[in-house]
Amino acid sequence: MSVKSFMWTRASLLMVSVLTAWQVFRHRLSKAPIQTALEEVIGMGTPRGIRNHNPTNIEYHARNDWLGQTGSDGRFAVFTSPEYGIRAAAKLLRRYQQREGLGTVRDLLSKWAPAGQDNPHLDNYIRHVAKRMGIHPTQHKVLSSQYPVMIAAMIEFENGVQPYEMNTIAYGVSLA
């Protein structure tokens, strides 16, 4: 086979591949609105808590009518914006402290995400959050002024990423 015919064959295969990919793409677009197709592409790989605007993965309960909550994805609450999901997290932390007398990072996270079959990583969670906060997990009471830093660390642990600016988190906490 000559170099010229090899190059021609290679170019032909590339063109066929491009045309096939274009036809598949056009077919998919014709079956779904462009917005849906874009959401699918954008949402690929996005952690559930970020997609749901529920960055601390608060479980859905019908009796909890959180401000900004739009429903559930089956297990977790869905909010209209991350600020409302963060607000709910701050309200829960405050409730745990005021009504149940929990104060340390260990106390709060043991209530938040109890150890068990669904959460074998509680000790890692506690260490991660305490380290990010710069405090010992059992020796310091968490102050409400520390909620933004604590919630940022919780978001990072829950989702593997913490995509929000600290002022967004602080605003969500201030809504509580």
Regions found by a protein language model. Name each.
Residues V3-L29:
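Single-pass alpha-helical membrane anchors
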Residues W22-A176:
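Cell-wall polysaccharide-cleaving catalytic domain and substrate-binding groove, primarily
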Residues M1-M7, A89, Q97:
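Amphipathic secondary-structure elements and adjacent low-complexity, charged linkers
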